Amino acid sequence: MMKNLPEVGNGGGSGFPAVSVGNKKNKYQRMDSDAEESQNHREAEARNSRTRKYVMACAFFASLNNVLLGYDVGVMSGAVLFIQQDLKITEVQTEVLIGSLSIISLFGSLAGGRTSDSIGRKWTMALAALVFQTGAAVMAVAPSFEVLMIGRTLAGIGIGLGVMIAPVYIAEISPTVARGFFTSFPEIFINLGILLGYVSNYAFSGLSVHISWRIMLAVGILPSVFIGFALCVIPESPRWLVMKGRVDSAREVLMKTNERDDEAEERLAEIQLAAAHTEGSEDRPVWRELLSPSPVVRKMLIVGFGIQCFQQITGIDATVYYSPEILKEAGIQDETKLLAATVAVGVTKTVFILFATFLIDSVGRKPLLYVSTIGMTLCLFCLSFTLTFLGQGTLGITLALLFVCGNVAFFSIGMGPVCWVLTSEIFPLRLRAQASALGAVGNRVCSGLVAMSFLSVSRAITVGGTFFVFSLVSALSVIFVYVLVPETSGKSLEQIELMFQGGLERKDGEVELGDAERLVRKEQEF
């Protein structure tokens, strides 16, 4: 009787089409597999989205201190016009007031390296905000030049701490593929602060001389208030946590800031290797190693310190601080029109830094530096020619404003953000905080020297002659980038260290973790 039963799948004796049980089973398996893959893909996309938002929030809050520097640069360019009238300060006092912040901030930067290694990157940012708030409050109520300088000193120390630590922190929490994008946030916020300073100048310029500049300076306190909220959101740097032996805490942070668990574990392994090397080098103090460097560290210092100095000696802070003076030289005499023109400069600077953030990882650091330095050289030379031969007329005013905006645009597309990204990337873990502090010192010293001498030098060789000198220095920066600056895009911080040390084994442009292990063993043998 069993033989007379129709076979399922052959259609015998039944009115149904033949269906194979095996095929039907395979079909359901494929459907289950597709559904599982789709679910896994959705989960991966959701995690990637959460990771990007989390790292972006960390970079955002860590960069708030940089708004303070930008705001001070922008607001002081206009506030000083009213301070001169209210406190009756001289030209030399004006140069000291403007340029001293950069010189004073170097002490904050120098202290920042050791401070951040001791109390952590996160709490160093909090300290920076607190010190700046105190300084801004003192400046806002200052009855004399002397009290104004006391507030300026406190603000400078706070800015030095904040400017040094933000790029280091962001570089240490960011995933490799987007590190350039996130590490450029501090420069974005500096530019945003400059724009806010220019807008504040314009907004409060109609008030009385005694009140206007005080409100302009007091507004600078507001961004630092948000730092308190930031401390509730951002984690500590995983690399600092490993240095302190808190490996589990570091793993938790890396799980939040990397898109895949295996990537987080790989980064943790690299950091632990670097930290082990650091522990083996603790018998040699960091500052001694920086001041008496090995050939490899010397190469890193030349690149990091050199790019920081070139960023400032090409005259960008002179352009921003003294843009009203430059445009007055071109022919604009009305103060309100001068301050309105500076807003255009601030908008240009901010827009182009935003472009740079989206290009810095895809295009690379070095191509942006080429575009930036060559463009700045041309704009500075053309500005020099315009101020010397075409000033005081409509054409001269138009061209001067165009070339000032062009200069800040080319600066913002490359030299502005890439400088800080490179400095935070190229140094090994044991040196990173204090080497970055040393780079920030070079940056602030050069900025201060330019800002404190611009009016005097312009008086001696004219404003046009001063910008001709800046154009020559900018031309030298093109050569510096070509000869010495490496491409760091797409490499982890530990891989960049290996790139400077040489002898790497590369596969499709990547440095294998095995290379790091062999290099650490090799160094520990010596």
From Swiss-Prot:
Function noted in UniProt: Plasma membrane sugar-proton symporter.
Organism: Arabidopsis thaliana (Mouse-ear cress)
Superkingdom of origin: Eukaryota
NCBIfam families in the record: SP
Keyword flag Manganese: no
Extent of Basic and acidic residues compositional bias: 29-47
Protein name as it appears in the record: Probable polyol transporter 4
Cell compartment(s), UniProt: Membrane
InterPro entries: MFS_dom, MFS_sugar_transport-like, MFS_trans_sf, Myo-inositol_Transporter, PLT1-6, Sugar/inositol_transpt, Sugar_transporter_CS
Statement: the UniProt record of this protein carries the keyword Cytoplasm: no
Segments traversing the membrane: 63-83, 92-112, 125-145, 153-173, 180-200, 215-235, 300-320, 340-360, 371-391, 395-415, 437-457, 465-485
Chain coiled-coil ranges: none
Region entry Disordered, spans: 1-21, 28-47
Pfam families the UniProt entry points to: Sugar_tr
Gene Ontology MF annotations: carbohydrate:proton symporter activity
Cellular component terms per the entry's GO annotation: membrane
Keyword terms: Membrane, Sugar transport, Symport, Transmembrane, Transmembrane helix, Transport
